[in-house]
Curated annotation (Swiss-Prot):
Membrane topology of the entry: Peripheral membrane protein
Major localisation: membrane
Sorted UniProt keywords: ATP-binding, Cell membrane, Cytoplasm, Membrane, Nucleotide-binding, Protein transport, Translocase, Translocation, Transport
Name of protein: Protein translocase subunit SecA 2
Listed SMART domains: SecA_DEAD, SecA_PP_bind
Deletion phenotype: No effect on cell growth, significantly reduces export of the cell wall protein SrpA. The small amount that is exported seems to be glycosylated normally.
Reaction catalyzed: ATP + H2O + cellular proteinSide 1 = ADP + phosphate + cellular proteinSide 2
Keyword Cytoplasm listed: yes
C-alpha cells in the first residue's frame, strides 16, 4: 500500500520532470522534418556546443533527447513514449527510475546514454548477465552508430577467451559500452594490476546506468569480487574438526542465533574441545588455528544449508544467491569457510587461495562520476538507496493502467497441504488453456513440481537459472495458450512475457508463487511477470507454517501446537482467525529478514571502508609509478634515507656485522668495502654510509642498462613489484582479519572499531614495507635481455 505522503512527493518530482518532457515534445515536432543527414549532423553540433562551453549536458537534454527519439523511430521503428522520456530524465539526473515490467527500459536508457556519450568520456549500460548485455547491445547498436557514436559489448562472448594485447583498451575506447557488473568489476581489478602504462585499459568511469539496480547494488552489495592468488598454507584440520563438531549439542556445547548468522561455543563446548584436542587453553595463541577451524566448522554445519545456501553439483560446492535463487558457479566463500562446507559434505577439501585484489559492487559504482539505475521495485529500497548512494527513487507512471489482479495469499497448515492445493489450482487453470507460471524459491522445489505435473500428463518447461540464454527464450514463450512453466525466482529475469493469441480473453498469464521470498521486492518482481503493458493477468502467493521464511526468521511456535493438526484441513484453511494469524507471522518474518539484510549490508559497508580507502591510496601510488617517464633524473635518495633511518631505529644495537649483513640482504651482493671507518654508535653516520652504498649500486645498475628507456622500464617494474607484493599480503590479511573479527563479535560496533584499528596499524606497516622493498628491488634486481632483445627483470 502506498503512503499518501510518498504519492505526493512522487507527484511533485514528476511535476518538474513533465516540464522538461514538454520541451522535448516541442523539439520532437521540429526534428521530425529534418532529413536523415540533418538529424545525424546534430551529434557533431552537440559535441561542438559542449566543447565550446555554449551548452552543458543539462541544457542540451531536451534537444538531444528529441534527436535520439526521432532516430529511434527511423532506425528501430520504436518511438519513445512520454513515460519513457520521464524515465530517461530521471536516469540523466543520476537517480533511480522505477519502471514496471514491459515499460521499455531498454529503449529508455538509449537517450541518457546518447546524451552523456556526447561528452566523449564514455558511458556504460550495466546489467546482471552476459545474455541481457549482449541482447540489448545488439538491439540498440544500430541506433548509436546511425547517430555517429561508437558502441561495443564490454567483453568477447566466447568461453575462456584470451584477450590479445590492446584488445580491451579498444573495447573501452567506444562511446557506449554494454556490459555486466561482474565483467566491469573484474576489469577494474585487472586494470589495477597492470605492470605498465600500456597495459592499462580502463578509462575513468564517467556515467553508468545499472539495470536491475536493486539486485546489483543492494542484494549483491555484500558479495565481493575477488581475484585469487597463490595457495595459502592449507590446514589439515577441516575433516578432523568436522568430526568433533558432530558430537556437540546445541544449548549445551554451543549457542546460535540463525537470524543473525551467529554461533559460538559455550563453556562446556570449550571444555569438550580442550579435552578432544588435548590442549590446555583453547584461546591461547598456540591454539588460534584450531579455534578458527572450529568456528568455521560450526558455521558450515549449522548456518549454511544444502539446497538453500549451496548445491553439491558435479563434485563441487556451488553457492546460491539467497535473495534471487540464482546459482553462482565459480564463486567461493572466503577465509576457509568454503573448505569447511566441503568437509561437512564429506568432499575432498579444495585449496584455499590468498586474495590478490577485491572490491564490492557498492564501492565499484561509487567510482563513477555519476550513475543511475532502473528497476521495477525501487521504491521498497528507497531508504537504502538514499543512505548508501544519495539516490532518490522516482516512480514512473505506466503507459497503460495495470490490470493484473494480485490475489490475497492462500494459507495452509503444512507444505504438503499447500502443494496439493497448488497442483489442484494449476490443473484447473491449465484446463481452461490459460498459461501458468509457477515460481519456486529453490531449484529442488521446481524440480519436484515439474516431475509431478509430468506425471499428471501436463507438459511443462523447467527453468532453474542455469542456462540464461535458453531460459530467456523459454520464459518469453510462457504467455502462449496452454503453456505451463515451472521456474525459480531468477530464471529468465529481464525477459518480457508477451501474451499469445487468445490468452487475453482467458484472463492473461497466471503467476503462482510457492512461498514469500526473503525480500518483498522479490515478491513484487515475481508478481510483475504478469500484467505487462496493461495486459490482464493474476498472481497469488501460497503460504504455510512450513515455509522457509517462517522457519528461518519467525519465533512463532504456532506450528508446534499439536491441536492445530487435529483440526480438519479444509475447515482450518477457511478460518479467518487462522489465516490472519499465519499472514501476520509471514509478514513479520519477512520484515525481520529485510531488516537483517539491511543491517548486514550496513555492516559490510562499514567493514569495506578501510580496504576501500587503502585500495584507493595504493592504486594512486601504482599510477604514479606508471607515469614515471624520466627515471634517470629522479632522486631516490629521500626514499632510501627513510628506509635506512627505519633500519637504524629498529635495531637495538648497531654492529659492524649487522650493518654488513643488511647491505648484503638489501643493497649489494658484491659488497667488499672496509667499514672500519664507520662509527656504528652514530646512527646518522650509518645512514650516511648506507646512502653512499645505495648511490653506488644505483649508478652501477644504470650503467648495466642499454638505454634510458630500459632503465625507466626497470624502475617502474621493480617499484610495482614492491607495491604489489605488499598490497597482496595486506588484502589477504584484511580478508582474514574481517572473518576473525566477525566470528568473535558479530554485529557489534566494537568489532568494527577493532577491525578499523588493526587495519590502520597494518596499513602503516605495509607502507613501511613497500619503501623497504622498493630500495631492495631497485638495488638487487637484475635485468637481462632475451633472444628478441626484450628486457627480463629478475627480482631478489
Amino acid at each position: 500500500m502506498k503512503h499518501k505522503l510518498d504519492v505526493t512527493i512522487n507527484e511533485l518530482r514528476l511535476k518538474s520532470i513533465r516540464k522538461i518532457v514538454k520541451r522535448i515534445n516541442t523539439w520532437s515536432d521540429e526534428v521530425k522534418s529534418y532529413s536523415d543527414d540533418a538529424l545525424k549532423q546534430k551529434t557533431i553540433e552537440f559535441k561542438e556546443r559542449l566543447a565550446s562551453g555554449v551548452d552543458t549536458l543539462d541544457t542540451l537534454l531536451p534537444e538531444a533527447y528529441a534527436v535520439a527519439r526521432e532516430a529511434s523511430w527511423r532506425v528501430l521503428g520504436m518511438y519513445p513514449k512520454e513515460v519513457q522520456l520521464i524515465g530517461a530524465i530521471v536516469l540523466h539526473e543520476g537517480n533511480i527510475a522505477e519502471m514496471q515490467t514491459g515499460e521499455g527500459k531498454t529503449l529508455t536508457a538509449t537517450m541518457p546514454l546518447y546524451l552523456n556519450a556526447l561528452s566523449g568520456k564514455g558511458t556504460y549500460l550495466i546489467t546482471t548477465n552476459d545474455y541481457l548485455a549482449k541482447r540489448d547491445f545488439e538491439e540498440m547498436q544500430p541506433l548509436y552508430e546511425w547517430l555517429g557514436l561508437t558502441a561495443s559489448l564490454g567483453f568477447v562472448d566466447i568461453v575462456d577467451y584470451e584477450y590479445q594485447k590492446g584488445e580491451k583498451r579498444n573495447i573501452y575506447e567506444h562511446d557506449i559500452i554494454y556490459t555486466t557488473n561482474g565483467r566491469l568489476g573484474f576489469d577494474y581489478l585487472i586494470d589495477n594490476l597492470a605492470d605498465s602504462a600500456e597495459g592499462k585499459f580502463l578509462p575513468q568511469l564517467n556515467y553508468g546506468i545499472i539495470d536491475e539496480v536493486d539486485s546489483i547494488i543492494l542484494d549483491a552489495a555484500q558479495t565481493p569480487l575477488v581475484i585469487s592468488g597463490a595457495p595459502r598454507l592449507q590446514s589439515n584440520l577441516f575433516h578432523i574438526v568436522k568430526e568433533f563438531v558432530d558430537t556437540l549439542i546445541e544449548d549445551v556445547h554451543f549457542k546460535m542465533k540463525k537470524t543473525k548468522k551467529e554461533i559460538w561455543l559455550l563453556n562446556q563446548g570449550i571444555e569438550a574441545a580442550q579435552s578432544y584436542f588435548n590442549v590446555e587453553d583453547l584461546y591461547s595463541e598456540q591454539a588460534m588455528v584450531l579455534v578458527r577451524n572450529i568456528n568455521l566448522a560450526l558455521r558450515a554445519q549449522y548456518l549454511f544449508e544444502s539446497n538453500v545456501d549451496y548445491f553439491v553439483y558435479n563434485g563441487d560446492i556451488v553457492l546460491i544467491d539467497r535473495i534471487t535463487g540464482r546459482m553462482l558457479p565459480g564463486t567461493k566463500l572466503q577465509a576457509g569457510l568454503h573448505q569447511a562446507i566441503e568437509a561437512k559434505e564429506g568432499m575432498e577439501v579444495s585449496t584455499d587461495k590468498s586474495v590478490m585484489a577485491t572490491i564490492t559492487f557498492q564501492n565499484l559504482f561509487k567510482l563513477f562520476e555519476s550513475f543511475s539505475g532502473m528497476t521495477a521495485t525501487g521504491k521498497l529500497g528507497e531508504s537504502e538507496f538514499f543512505d548508501l548512494y544519495s539516490k532518490i527513487v522516482v516512480q514512473v507512471p505506466t503507459d497503460k493502467a495495470i490490470q493484473r489482479i494480485d490475489e490475497p495469499d492462500k494459507v495452509f497448515r503444512s507444505v504438503d497441504e499447500k502443494n496439493i492445493a497448488m497442483i489442484h489450482d494449476i490443473v484447473e487453470l491449465h484446463e481452461t488453456g490459460r498459461p501458468v507460471l509457477l515460481i519456486t524459491r529453490t531449484a529442488e522445489a521446481a524440480e519436484y513440481f515439474s516431475k509431478v505435473l509430468f506425471q499428471m500428463d501436463i507438459p511443462n518447461n523447467l527453468l532453474i537459472a542455469q542456462n540464461v540464454a535458453k531460459e530467456a527464450q523459454m520464459i518469453a514463450e510462457a504467455g502462449q495458450i496452454g503453456s505451463m512453466t515451472v521456474a525459480t525466482s531468477m530464471a529468465g529475469r529481464g525477459t518480457d512475457i508477451k501474451l499469445g493469441e487468445g490468452v487475453e480473453a482467458l484472463g492473461g498469464l497466471a503467476v503462482i508463487i510457492h512461498e514469500h521470498m526473503e525480500n518483498s521486492r522479490v515478491d513484487r518482481q515475481l508478481r510483475g511477470r504478469s500484467g505487462r503493458q496493461g495486459d490482464p493477468g493474476s498472481s497469488c502467493i501460497y503460504i504455510s507454517l512450513d515455509d522457509y521464511l517462517v522457519k528461518r526468521w519467525s519465533d512463532s511456535n504456532l506450528a508446534e501446537n499439536n491441536q492445530l493438526y487435529s483440526l480438519d484441513a479444509q475447515r482450518l484453511s477457511q478460518s479467518n482467525l487462522f489465516n490472519r494469524k499465519v499472514k501476520q507471522i509471514v509478514v513479520k518474518a519477512q520484515r525481520i529478514s529485510e531488516e537483517q539484510g539491511v543491517k548486514a549490508r550496513e555492516m559490510a559497508n562499514e567493514f569495506e571502508k578501510s580496504i576501500s580507502i587503502q585500495r584507493d591510496l595504493v592504486y594512486e601510488e601504482r599510477n604514479r609509478v606508471l607515469e614515471i617517464d624520466d627515471a634517470e633524473n629522479q632522486d631516490f635518495k629521500a626514499l632510501a634515507k627513510d628506509v635506512f633511518e627505519m633500519f637504524v631505529n629498529e635495531e637495538k644495537v648497531l654492529t659492524k656485522s649487522r650493518v654488513v649483513e643488511y647491505i648484503y640482504q638489501n643493497l649489494s651482493f658484491q659488497f667488499n668495502k672496509d667499514v672500519a671507518c664507520v662509527n656504528f654508535k652514530d646512527k646518522q653516520a650509518v645512514v650516511t654510509f648506507l646512502l653512499e652504498q645505495f648511490e653506488k649500486q644505483l649508478a652501477l645498475n644504470r650503467k648495466n642498462m642499454q638505454s634510458a628507456y630500459y632503465y625507466n622500464i626497470f624502475v617502474q617494474k621493480v617499484f610495482l613489484k614492491a607495491i604489489d607484493s605488499c598490497w597482496l599480503e595486506q588484502v589477504d590479511y584484511l580478508q582474514q582479519l574481517k572473518a576473525s573479527v566477525n566470528q568473535r563479535q558479530n554485529g557489534q560496533r566494537n568489532a568494527i572499531f577493532e577491525y578499523h584499528r588493526v587495519a590502520l596499524d597494518s596499513f602503516e606497516v605495509m607502507t613501511r614495507n613497500i619503501k623497504k622493498r622498493m630500495v631492495k628491488n631497485i638495488c638487487q634486481s637484475m635485468i637481462t635481455f632475451d633472444k628478441e632483445g626484450m628486457p627480463v627483470i629478475h627480482f631478489p
